[in-house]
Amino acid sequence: FDPTNKKRHYERMKYTQRKKAILLLADGTIFEGKSIGRDGTAFGEICYNTGMTGYQEIFTDPSYFGQLMLATNAHIGNYGINEEEIESNSIKISGLICKNFSFNFSRVNAQDSLDNYFEKQNLMAISDIDTRAVVRYIRDKGAMNAIISTETDIDALKEKLNAVPNMKGLELASKVSTTESYYFGDEQATYKISALDLGI
């Protein structure tokens, strides 16, 4: 550790000052971890992704709108973010669950760290979770809603969780689509293809 490196010192400070957080499943099961991004509470149906790379594409994928994303990849954040790799105009997941979250990143064309990106997008995440154990659990028990939170009143969190609607049958396309027409590519091209944006 080099105390003269201000960037490293800042990242180390953020790592050591993380707050305790919990992952609460709809059946009452609790997993303990550390918070990333904003404090507070985030909720949604818990789902998981086993991809080894491409976390930024996953977080901005409209098909995951409103879900708590559990990443089974052991390291999240280690190559930062690049705005050219987003799948939509903003993060679409409601929160992130991961094992190891990296405040340091190493990539030539990275534009920022993932934790700074989360803070700008007002996203909450929880790390230090045994993600493989959670995947095995929800794979056996089935899809369910969940909450991640820095709050400590479990009974109050259970009440909030009970009020979260089931995603089955929810109309979500309008929340990730656009209200205006727009172009990809050359507007003067000879051949044109029309597409209905339900979350491109």
What name fits each language-model region?
Residues M13-I200:
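N-terminal beta1-alpha1 cap of cysteine-dependent amidohydrolase-like domains
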